[in-house]
């Protein structure tokens, strides 16, 4: 009789008296993929996402909010991993009273891009490539922080390196973007700023 024992994600066969099988068989068994990895892709790596528009973790200037010009911030990032075909960007506010509120959706940015300038237009089709989606204000492009009066809200900007060109329809929503890229994300980067009124 053999007894099956699972330990540390590897299958190990033991004799009834718990003597180990011959070394060659054990080596073969050790090649079994751990359970926590089976059916999953390797964890995505990180990209450093930077901005000159505000200090990460600090307060976002009014210029980038509904209280002033409401223009998009400048962004720059480091090289993505091999195989990157496009980039996507999502900005959201997880502290909104009604739940996470989406301020910016961008997708199919060319893989050669390493930055975006400040004050992009609100057009769906971006100059040089890429598209802007529909935010939770029901607008295309960027709509900056505009929280109700009170405590500061956090605004997360996330960049995704994507292994495909998504070819989503114009003005896609964050939900549609998430669903399209979920199994194609190769790396990601993140910034957070705060704003209060």
Give the location of each predicted region.
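Hydrophobic alpha-helical segments, especially transmembrane helices
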Residues: 16-18, 104
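Bacterial N-terminal signal peptides
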Residues: 19-32
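N-terminus-centered regions that define maturation/targeting leaders and the start
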Residues: 35-197
């Amino acid at each position: 009789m053999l007894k099956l024992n699972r330990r540390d994600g590897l299958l190990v066969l033991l004799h009834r008296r718990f003597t180990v099988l011959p070394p060659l068989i054990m080596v073969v068994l050790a090649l079994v993929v751990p359970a926590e990895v089976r059916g999953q892709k390797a964890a995505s790596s990180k990209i450093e996402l930077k901005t000159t528009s505000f200090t990460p973790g600090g307060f976002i200037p009014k210029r980038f909010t509904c209280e002033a010009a409401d223009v998009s911030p400048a962004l720059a990032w480091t090289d993505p991993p091999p195989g990157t075909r496009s980039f996507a960007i999502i900005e959201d506010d997880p502290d909104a009273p009604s739940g996470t509120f989406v301020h910016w959706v961008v997708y199919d940015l060319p893989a050669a891009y390493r930055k975006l300038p400040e004050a992009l237009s609100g057009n769906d089709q971006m100059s040089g490539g890429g598209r802007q989606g529909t935010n939770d204000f029901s607008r295309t492009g960027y709509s900056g922080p505009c929280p109700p009066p009170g405590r500061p809200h956090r605004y997360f900007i996330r960049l995704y390196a994507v292994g495909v060109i998504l070819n989503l329809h114009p003005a896609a929503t964050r939900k549609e973007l998430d669903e399209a890229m979920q199994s194609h994300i190769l790396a990601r980067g993140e910034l957070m700023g705060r704003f209060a009124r």
